[in-house]
Amino acid sequence: MNTLLQRINISTTKAPELIDITDQVEEVVAASQIRDGVAIVYSKHTTAAIKINENEPLLLQDMAHFLEKCAPRNGNYLHNDFTIRKNMPDDECPNGHAHCQHLLLGTSESIPIISG
């Protein structure tokens, strides 16, 4: 079985930010010359998620509102209480809401590759 590991770097400017990476994934698959298999798209960050859905502007707004309702940015998260947290990185930010939102979404999608 042929395998390929390719990194796609995505920069964000706000939270939440819903970014369509379809073109980048399709380019990697095409360049790989793998005709049949599975593309696994994965985010290694604990506050970034991978989901397949429709890229329709009003739906994207609905999704952002849904995430905010489920885990509001201004909610009370122990993760954000830096007076009680231990072993934090120097650049830590109060992002408990983003970790909780991530629980709803997940880190990866498996996409079948059929005939390229």
Stretches with model-predicted labels:
Residues 1-116:
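Active-site histidine-anchored catalytic micro-motif
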